[in-house]
Amino acid sequence: MQTCISKQKELTFDDIINYYSKGENQNKRIGLEYERISIDSKTFKQAKFESLFEIIKEFSKINGFELIYDNETIIGAKNNEGSSISLEPGGQFELSLAPKEKLYNVHFAAQNYISQIDYIAEKYGIKFFAIGNQPKTTFNEMEILNKRRYKIMAGYLPTIGRLAPVMMRETAGVQINLDYKNSVDAKRKIKAAILISPFLTGFFANSPFRENKLTKYKSIRALAWKYTGPDRCNLFYKGIIDYTYKNIYELYANYILDVPMIFISRENNYLELNGKITFRDFMKEGYKGLYATMEDYLVHQSLCFPDVRLKNCIEIRNHDSQNLDVAVGIGAIYKGLLYNDNAIDKILDYFAPLTSSDLEDYGFLAAKFGVNFNVEKLNTKAFEIVKKLLYLAQFNLEADEQKYLDWLIDLVNSKRCIADIILDGVKNNL
């Protein structure tokens, strides 16, 4: 890889803070990023990439999407309105929707695209499973998408997290994106989302199977993320919970700057770093004649994987994949909770006794038990907490959007999570 001879404008901390400031807006939109597991319908193993490429091409031709390549490899497609489809490392198929104000419009747009994708996929013998983990194929049997950053990540991440290969190749999730008005609003939303994250992780646990058999966990996906890398996953920016601070942009950026870098990209080439320096080091000193740019920072922060991530929106990422109705229901929960100041106040007050260490512990319990574990600090059970959250969210939704939570409320009233439905079905068929 050739290094740069002339130094570009030095990237400053203020540049990074300005990036987050430019994300501010007064909207109250819901963005949905929806991954599903790609399965060969005959073998129930990982789908072949060649078939997935054909699905992308055919879908793009119908909908006027532009194909996205990494060198010669198709990695996705996008339209000019902000929606896209893409492939994850193990062939997980992701639909990313442009954010919308109304949940109905999110649901309609997603259903329209998904029905097309599924129809095309049937011709290639492919099915997409809305679950959190590959049920049969394990990472050591799987191909990885021929995308250069994935190949580099696949080499580095297992050195810092023993389940990183599981996370990369086997898992699929639901991500909800929210707007923020300013740094204070972003801080409140992010903190509230983090405080409730282990309990919603448990409620939406949907990956009890791996290697074609039941595991001891209700969310293998959540467990895998716990062992992917403590310096870049889960709640690595603990200060948001454990001490008082003024500006969330500064707090978050400082944590991102201290995360080790995986690679630097220049002119379609990659220089592997594999954790040798942090981004703060790169900003101060450069590396082999290269100097930090804003694009470098954006790539670097995208390689940090907390459950709640700040970009030019707030990304909430801690849910196993679900059927579409449930995925939209997840969006409904956050719309009802985090676009209402009174609801945020109630969350911050109720969960105030919890520390970052508590949240980490409850995250492990959620992965194993779903919603059936004690929350001793709050003197209650996890399913009781989820029940409170769902009723609060439904109360704050518009009348025509409350229906998205009806079934979920029935489920939590039965003291069960999504995975329990699968497990009950297995027991009934024994």
Question: Where is each model-derived feature located?
Answer:
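Residues forming anionic-ligand binding surfaces in small-molecule and nucleic-acid pockets
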Residues: 85-101, 166-175
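Long, hydrophobic, well-ordered secondary-structure blocks that form the structural core
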Residues: 129-148, 194-200, 212-215
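Acidic, His- and aromatic-enriched active-site or binding-groove loops in soluble protein domains
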Residues: 146-167
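Glycine-rich, histidine-containing beta strand-loop boundary motifs that form or position
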Residues: 97, 130-134, 180, 204
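Anion (oxyanion) recognition and catalysis
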Residues: 30, 118-122
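C-terminal accessory/tail domains of diverse enzymes
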Residues: 1-91, 98, 184-189, 195, ...
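Carboxylate/His-rich catalytic cores and anion/metal-binding grooves
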Residues: 121-131
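Membrane helical hairpin/interfacial module
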Residues: 90, 97-98, 103-106, 110-115, ...
